Amino acid sequence: MARRISPVVAFLLCFGLSHFFEAEARLQHSVALHRQKREWIVPPQILEENVDYTKKDFIAKIRSDKEVAHMKYLRYSLRGVGADQEPFNLFVVNPETGYVRITGILDRESISQYNLSGIALFTDGSIAENDIGLRIKVKDQNDNAPVFGVMNPGAVDELSAVGTEVMRLNCFDADEPGNPNSQIKYEIVDQQPAGQSMFTVENNRRVVVANPNLDRETVDQYVLLVKASDLNGAPGGNAATGTVTIKINDVNDNVPTLGGPYEASIEENTEKVEVMRLKVSDLHLKGTDNWEGDCYIASGNEAGYFSIHMDPKTNEAVLMLDKAVDYEDVKDLNLGIGVANKAPFHPSVSGGSQGATISFGGSGGGAGSGAAGGAGAMGGASGSGGGTGASSWSSSGVPLYNVNIKVKNQPEGPKFFPGTKAIPISEGKAFDSTEIIARYPAIDTDTGKEATNVKYIKSSDPDNWLTIDEKTGAIRMNKAPDRESKYLVNGTYYAKVLSITQDLPSKTATGTIAIQVEDFNDHCPTLISNVQTLCTDKDAVLVTAKDEDAPPNGAPFDFNIVSEGTAGKWTVEYMNDTTAIFRTHEKLWPGPHELMVEVTDQQGLKCPEPQKLQVDVCTCKNQGGCDRTATGDAKKGSRLGPAGIGLLLLALLALLLIPLLLLLCTCGMTGAFTDMPFETKVHLISSNTEGQGEDRDVPLMCPPSNVDGMGFMTKDYMAVGAMHSAGLGLGVGAGVGAAGFLESTSTMGGRGYNEMELDYMNSIGRNNAYSSRDMAGDFDGMALSDGYLCEYYSQKSRVVDGFGKDDPMVYDYEGKGSPVGSVGCCSLLEDQNDLEFLNDLGPKFTTLADICGGKKTEIPAPAPAPLPPPPKPVVDRSEVVSSTTNILNTGNIATNRVNTVNVASNMATASSTRVENVLVTDNRPTMITSVHPAPTLLVQPQPMYYMVEQQPSTVLVAERPAMTQGMYVLNSGPVAEGMVVQGGNIAANTLTRGERMVLVFRGGPAQALNNGMLHTSNLSGSQLLLVDGGATSGQVLQGTIQRGVAGSQGLMFVDGQGGQVIQGSINNGISTHGGSQNVFYVENKGGSSVVQGGLQMGKASTAGSLIGDVGIGGSSVKITQNPSSHKVVVQERKVVTTQSVK
C-alpha cells in the first residue's frame, strides 16, 4: 500500500521549485532583450474592386512606438506585391507619417488580396523594429458573366436509361468561387431536332438522359443550346449560352431480316454446289458487328445435307448443298433459317413482342417502326399477294424463315440393293456347282423394279469362289467354301459384282457379295431408346437402331412408321446408316405421343412386331432442356436436408468412437514382460520343478528322418565338444570302464540353455551351461515336443528310482586320494565279463529287438569267464579336467610327448541331423554276416520312463538328448548304418553323420580295429568311437580320421596296457561350416608315445573349442589354457582325488 505524503512536505517541495524557476527566470531576463509594444494606428480595411479610392488621404496608417520612446524620427516604407513589386506603387506610404494610400482601381479577378510589409528605420538607416504585416483584401463584384469553353461532342447509347450521364459542360465564372456571383444555373433552351426533350443539364454541369427512347435509327445526333446564368439564375445576374452536340451510339436493338419467300430446287445425287443466296437487311450502322448478319439453319437439316455461311462484303447468306440427296428418299426439304448479328442482341429485343422489334409481313404491308411494328405484321397477313414472311420464332426470340427446296429426279442407272448381299453357307454342306445360292439383281431406281437392259460381271473374286449369270444375276459356287481360307475376313468372303447398262453412255453400279461361312442373320434390329424428347418449337427427333449381327447382316437400316397405332402425321428422313429423322407435320401439344416403328436390316430382316416409340413433347428452356413443370409432369423428388446431414455426421462420429473404445480396452490388458535389469546368467537355471510324471509304458520308436541338401539329418543334436558344452566321463583301471554322456538342449526367448549329464559307473554328474547363441536356425519347430518330454521323464525316473542313493556331491576340493590300494575307482566294477544280464533285460528289450530286427533272435548265454584280478593302481591320483577354450586363430600347442594338436570348431548350420546308434559286442569269434534290415515302424511318441536296473557291469550306449526316441540297430545294413560284430575280427564300415560305435571286449587279436574304421571323408555330422577293453598289446587304431565338411568327430580310448595306441593322424580338410575333433587318450603305463602322428586341421571359418590332451605315466602334460572350472565327482565306494596339473 502506497504511503501518503504529508502536507508539510508537499508545501516545502512546491516552495523550493517555485524559487528555483524564479531564479532561473531572472537569470534569463538579465541577458534577454526587452520587448517593446507596437501599436496599429488604423487597421486595414477591405477594399472593393472597381471602386476609386484614390481620392482618399489614406486607406491605412502605420506607426512605431519607438518614435515616442526614443524621441527619434523614423522613416516608413512598404514592401510587397503592389508596392515595390508588380504592379508597382499601387500602394504608397508617407515615410514620415506612415499613412498608406492607393493609386489605382483594384480588380479581384487579377489579385484578390495584397500582402504588404511595413518597414520602420531610424534616420541612420538602422532597423527600428521588426516588419509589420499589412493585408488588403479585395471584395468581389459580379462583374463577370459565365463563359463556355471548348466542348467536345458527347455520346450515349441508344435506349439508355434515364439519368445516364452523357457528358460534362465546360463552363466557368471568373467571379469569386463560392460566391453567388459565380454560382451558375443551366438550362436547355433549344434541341435539334425538335421533339421530346431527351436530355437535361444538372447544376454540377452533368448532361444526363431525360428520355429512355433514344433511337439511333431515328435520330443519330442531337444539338443542344444551353444557357448558363450566375447568381443561380436570379434576376440581375449575368448569362451566357453554349452549343452542345450529342451523338447516339448504335446498339443491336433491331433484329436483322431476310427477304422472302424463298424457294429453290436441287438435283438429286449432286453435292458441293451453291443452292441460293439470302440477303440480310439490317437497320444498324453498316460495317459494324450490329449490322453484319449471322445466318444458321435452325431446323430441317438434321441429315446434314446443307450448310450456310455469310459473305461479309454483301452481307448475304450463301446456302450450300454438301451431301447428295436421293430423290427416292427425299423429294422436298423445308429449312428453317434463323438470322442474327455478330454482336449480341440488346436486352430490349424480345422476339418481336415489343416496340423495338421488327414485324415481317408480306408485300401487303410494310415493316412498322417503333411500337407500331405489330401492325405491320397484320398488314402482311391481309395484303393481297403477300408472302408468308417469318413463319415462326426460335426459342431465343429470333424469327425463322422458311426455305422450301425441291429435289429434282434425275435419270439414274441400276443400283444394287442392298449394297452388300450376305449369303450364309455352311462349310460342311455338300457342294453343287450348278445350284443357285442367291440372286443379286440390280434395281432400276426410277421404277423400283429389276433392271432389264443390264449385264452382270464379277469385279473382284480373290479366290474364284463364285460365278454369276450375266443376264439374271444368279450366283453359284465355283468351289466348296473353306473356313480356313486366307481370303476370309472374320469368317466372311467378299466379292464385288458390276451391273453395266447396255445403252450409251453406259452406267455402272457396284454391289458386294458377302459369303458367311458360319454366321447367320438371327437378330432383328431394335431401337436403342424407346423414349424421345421433343421441344414444342422443334419438329423432328432422332431415332437410332442397333443390330447384334455383324455386317452385312446389320446396318444400314430401313425405318418405316406404321400408321396403325401412330398419332399424328410423321415422315422419315435418313441421317446415316443407323439413325433416322422422324419429322412431324402437325403442331404437337405437350405430352406423350406414340409411334409404331418397323426397322429392317440390310438383309430385310425385321422384328415380328412393330416397336413402340414414345415421343414426349414439352416446353424447353433456353438451354434446350425440357421443362417438366410446364407440362405438368413434374416428378416429386427427395433431397438431403439438414436433418439427414446431421444423422450422417452422428454416424461418422459413432464409427470414430469405436476405435477409441478399442484403444481404451487395450490399455487395461496385461502388460508385456519387464526386461531384467541385469544379466541373468546362472540365475535362470533349469530347476525342473514340474514334478514327477505319471508312470506309463513307453514304446520304443524310431524317429523319422528328414532329408535336406546335406544328407540324412534329424532334429536331435548331440555333439562332443562341438556345438554346446559337453561333459566327459573317464574310467581308469584294470577292469572295463564305461563312459558316456547325455546332453539336452532347450530354448528360452531366442537363447539356448544346455544341460549335460555324465553317466560314469552308476553315478550322475551334471554340467549346466548357459549359451546366449541364437539357435533359431538350429532348432526350428522345436518347442517341448513329445520326444523331448519322453527324454526328460526318462532321466527323472532313472535318477529318482535307480540312483536314489547315489546323488552326486560336488565340492571345490576334497583333499588327496586315499593311499589304500584296495579303495579305488575300479573296486566296485565287480564282474564286468558277466553277460548274464542280457537274459534279464525284460520285455521292453524284446520289443526293441522285434522293432529293429524284425524277428526274435535267440542269443545263448555264454559261460561266465573267470574274473581277472583287478589291476593295481599305478598312480595314487586321478584327475578330471574340463577346459573350454575359444580359439580365434589356429596355432600349435606343444607338449613333451604329444604332437601338435590343432582344434577348431564351427557352428553347424544344418537344420537337422540323422543319428544312428551302433552297439558292437565282442564275446564270440563268430561274425554275423547276414542280418536283414527290419522295416522302420513309426509310432506317435508318448511320454515314458526308462526303468533301468542298477547293474554295475552294464555298459550303456551314450544316448542323445533328442526330441524323439532313439533306436538300437542290430544289423549290418547298407551304408549309413552300423553293424553288430561278435568275434575277434572287426569289419570296417563307414559311419555317417551322427553315428556312434561302442566296442566292448576283453581279449582278442592284436589288431582291434582295422584300418579305416572311422572314415567320413564326404559326410558331415558327428562321429563317436568309444573303445573299452583290455588289449594286451599291439596296434589298436591304424588309419586316419578324415573330415570333409562341418561336424564333429570324437575318439575315446581306454586301455590298461602299454603299446602304441594310435598311429596315423586325424585329418580335416577345409571346413566351411565349422566343427571340432576331439581325441582322448588314457594310458596306465608309460613306455611308448601316446600319440604318434598328429591332428591336422585345415582352414576353419570360425573358432571352435579345444579340449586339452592329458598324458599319464611319464609324459608331460601341457594345457593350452587355464581350465575354467574343476569339478570332482565323488560317489560311494569310490575314491577320486584331484591335483593341479602343471
Swiss-Prot record:
GO molecular function, one term: calcium ion binding
Phenotypic consequence of gene deletion: Morpholino knockdowns show increased embryonic lethality, with embryos that die developing one of two clear phenotypes following developmental arrest at 10 hpf. The first group show severe epiboly arrest with the desmosomal cadherins and enveloping layer becoming detached from the external yolk syncytial layer that continues to undergo epiboly. This results in a population of cells at the animal pole which maintain cell division and some gastrulation movements. In the second phenotype the enveloping layer is attached to the yolk but does not progress through epiboly.
Glycosylation sites: 115, 490, 576
Membrane-related topology note: Single-pass type I membrane protein
GO cellular component labels: cytoplasm; desmosome; plasma membrane
SMART domains associated with the record: CA
Transmembrane portions of the chain: 644-664
All residue ranges annotated as the Cadherin domain in the record: 64-148, 156-258, 259-416, 417-527
One Gene Ontology term from the biological process aspect of the record: desmosome assembly
Regions of this protein lying in the Extracellular compartment: 39-643
Ranges where the record places region Disordered: 369-389
UniProt signal peptide: 1-18
Location (main, coarse): other
InterPro entries: Cadherin-domain_protein (IPR050971), Cadherin-like_dom (IPR002126), Cadherin-like_sf (IPR015919), Cadherin_CS (IPR020894), Cadherin_Y-type_LIR (IPR000233), Catenin-bd_sf (IPR027397), Desmosomal_cadherin (IPR009122)
Localization per Swiss-Prot or TrEMBL: Cell junction, Desmosome; Cell membrane; Cytoplasm
Domain remark from Swiss-Prot or TrEMBL: Three calcium ions are usually bound at the interface of each cadherin domain and rigidify the connections, imparting a strong curvature to the full-length ectodomain.
Reported function: A component of desmosome cell-cell junctions which are required for positive regulation of cellular adhesion. Involved in the interaction of plaque proteins and intermediate filaments mediating cell-cell adhesion. Required for embryogenesis, specifically for progression of epiboly and normal convergence-extension movements during gastrulation.
Protein's name according to its UniProt entry: Desmoglein-2.1
